[in-house]
Amino acid sequence: MRKLTILGATGSIGASTLKVIAQNPQQFSIVALVAGVNVAKMYQLCQQWRPKYAVMATASAASELQGLLKNQAMATEVLYGEEAMCQVAALDDVDTVMAAIVGAAGLLPTMAAVKAGKRVLLANKEALVMSGQLFIDAVAQSGAELMPVDSEHNAIFQCLPTEIQTQLGRCDLSQHGIDHILLTGSGGPFRYSDLATLDSVTPEQAIAHPNWSMGPKISVDSATMMNKGLEYIEAKWLFNTSREQLKVLIHPQSVIHSMVQYQDGSVIAQLGEPDMATPISYAMAYPERVTAGVPALDFTRLQQLTFMEVDFARYPCLQLAMDACFLGQHATTSLNAANEVAVDAFLKRKIRFTDIALINDQVLSKVCATNTQLHCRDLESLLELDTMARHFAHQVLKERQA
């Protein structure tokens, strides 16, 4: 039986993970649940799953949860803060860690799981975007098992030979007859919108993704296609690709989750309903397969599968991410930080939808003008760079609002 810590238990990935565990109680059990400040949801999960540990982001949230659990005479130990998150990610009696804390906040707990040699189910793409080579090196040094959970990377993983699956980050695609990887994306809710109307897009419109059910931040990232940009960077590190070996394609139906094109002309694709329980169950049970509670894809109901080239005028954030990917670690770390600040400001109605790309561009340019790869030797310097990029982003925000 696999014993899990779930980082990000109250989010959408956490919910899908628990759905898979509920379907397969003989194969998986929960040791620790980790969340931000959603006490009501965490209390509900503690009642249902009875974890040994529950970790909240803040002391006040932990105190509130502790009070609720005490009233029910529950034995779950309540902890709080980043150090506690890292602690439960590295517990001896845990062998699998679902890394699903959104954004830069997930980096240190995810890295703690890696350094402890766990099977790390990587749903937090920002961890790789921010730390790249450091992350891959830590996986190699500890013997951790890296399993991609993002539907696209999981799809690519399923389309690759076993030799590459067991050598993520250090594989040679061409040696195994692979020409390139095709990363698919739906294009989000505005793929057919008049470009002139994007200025006036509301947070509610941006969050309404046509195919996937996701949290607010990732939904906005899908609308700008920054999400695909972050996935592009993650794919570069996971599959050790050159620029020529990694391509992005718009696929509105989200049925083909990604494809691998081989040198002999063959293309292997992974298809399925757009439900995160499928890639999560695959990553949890690998190399076996278990019930995910997802309906089978009904080919008779598929009207068509269509594909389009990316229009970078519509998706400038994707272009920024693809360029940053091959500029160096300083570029991807700072772009991710700027984007988190910009998306948060958009969700709070402080800026327009189209301002997200402008802020990202300005911060990236400023960081690249003052920093080089030499600044990214360790986690501390990466976190300093992250802080600096956020400071720049807040400065740009103030200037735009002045």
From Swiss-Prot:
Keyword Cell wall biogenesis/degradation annotated? no
Indicate which residues the UniProt annotation says bind Mn(2+).
Answer: D150, E152, E231
Instruction: Keyword check for Metal-binding, yes or no.
Output: yes
Q: Name one Pfam family in it.
A: DXPR_C
Enzyme Commission number = 1.1.1.267
Q: Which residues bind NADPH?
A: T10, G11, S12, I13, G36, N38, N124, E126, G215
| GO terms classed as biological process | isopentenyl diphosphate biosynthetic process, methylerythritol 4-phosphate pathway involved in terpenoid biosynthetic process
Q: Which residues form a coiled coil?
A: none
UniProt entry keywords in alphabetical sequence: Isoprene biosynthesis, Manganese, Metal-binding, NADP, Oxidoreductase
Q: Which Gene3D superfamilies match?
A: 1.10.1740.10, NAD(P)-binding Rossmann-like Domain
Output the InterPro entries linked to this UniProt entry. Answer: DXP_reductoisomerase, DXP_reductoisomerase_C, DXP_reductoisomerase_N, DXPR_C, DXPR_C_sf, NAD(P)-bd_dom_sf
Name the family.
Answer: Belongs to the DXR family.
Described by its record, this protein's role is as follows: Catalyzes the NADPH-dependent rearrangement and reduction of 1-deoxy-D-xylulose-5-phosphate (DXP) to 2-C-methyl-D-erythritol 4-phosphate (MEP).
What this protein is called in its record is: 1-deoxy-D-xylulose 5-phosphate reductoisomerase
